[in-house]
């Protein structure tokens, strides 16, 4: 089931079955929570903090995830999920600070921050995905993250880089359920989600290279409309979606944390080159986008994976990154 959560007048309260067809009188920013990792294993808590100058204290809520054995996980929340941050009726339009953390054993491992102005009317969408590319890259002063890379004050990780945490409220997209929950229908259709392992079986592995312009990329002369790219991690890492011979973290086409095709090359986040990461790519499926979340038992969109991941062997063949 999808879970939509409302911060009505900045008080966190649960809602069930929130519909995109209902337009509130007051403006909202619809916060979208998503991930390319596996809740319950890669992180066990999602924490949301909202601070508004009109309030004397910070408002917050935590959701827990846990392993229950046999490779299965349970949680307080299905992902992707939405949190409606509603403008106060007497609000001044001041900047609202939003912070989302993915924690593991109490340690913040992925932290996203944004500063936005809640609109006077209508519903805008703010996507804050908890992506593996931002693992252990947190804002300076984050409590409990002593071993992480620190972004300077006013900066937070986005696409593996420290970037300004202020969002242009006027540039935020209008809320559209289909851009979060696949086809926007009830969670009974497998094509609303992305079969991570199934789409990479028989694919290729490649190590991207960093060019003089600072772009991290690899050569690709195929059809980008049939391309998918993922970070390929050792099975021992147990991050993302794991088969017998590799774990994959899928990258979304067109996102800062994902990939784009450019002049016969595929450009990916720079951090993947500086960290010496290996990639997997395949032309078996249409490209995964942010609107098509992974298929998983914790998903609010699609069905559980069709095949038992323990029985899947990707069999990736080495490819050249090109000149």
Model-derived segments and spans:
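Signals and flexible motifs at protein termini associated with secretion
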Residues: 1-323
């Amino acid at each position: 089931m999808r879970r939509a959560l409302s911060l009505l007048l900045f008080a966190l309260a649960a809602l069930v079955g929130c519909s995109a067809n209902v337009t509130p009188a007051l403006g909202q920013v619809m916060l979208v929570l998503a991930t390319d990792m596996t809740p319950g294993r890669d992180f066990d808590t999602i924490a949301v903090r909202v601070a508004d100058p009109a309030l004397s204290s910070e408002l917050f809520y935590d959701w827990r995830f846990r392993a229950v054995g046999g490779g299965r996980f349970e949680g307080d929340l299905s992902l992707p999920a939405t949190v409606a941050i509603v403008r106060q009726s007497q609000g001044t339009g001041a900047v609202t600070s939003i912070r989302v953390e993915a924690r593991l054993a109490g340690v913040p491992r992925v932290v996203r921050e944004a500063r936005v102005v809640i609109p006077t009317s209508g519903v805008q969408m703010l996507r804050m995905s908890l992506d593996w590319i931002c693992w252990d890259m947190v804002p300076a002063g984050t409590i409990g993250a002593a071993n992480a890379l620190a972004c300077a004050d006013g900066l937070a990780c986005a696409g593996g880089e420290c970037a300004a945490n202020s969002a242009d409220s006027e540039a935020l997209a209008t809320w559209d359920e289909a851009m979060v929950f696949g086809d926007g229908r009830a969670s009974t259709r497998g094509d609303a989600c992305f079969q991570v392992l199934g789409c990479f079986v028989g694919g290729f592995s490649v190590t991207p290279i960093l060019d003089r312009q600072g772009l991290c990329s690899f050569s690709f002369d195929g059809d980008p409309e049939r391309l998918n790219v993922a970070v390929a991690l050792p099975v021992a890492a147990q991050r993302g979606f794991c088969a017998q011979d590799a774990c994959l973290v899928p990258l979304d086409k067109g996102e800062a944390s994902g990939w784009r095709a450019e002049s016969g090359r595929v450009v990916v986040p720079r951090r993947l080159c500086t960290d010496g990461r290996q990639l997997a790519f395949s032309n078996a499926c249409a490209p995964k986008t942010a609107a098509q979340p992974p298929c998983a038992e914790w998903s609010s969109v699609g069905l559980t994976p069709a095949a038992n991941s323990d029985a899947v062997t990707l069999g990736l063949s080495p490819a050249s990154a090109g000149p």
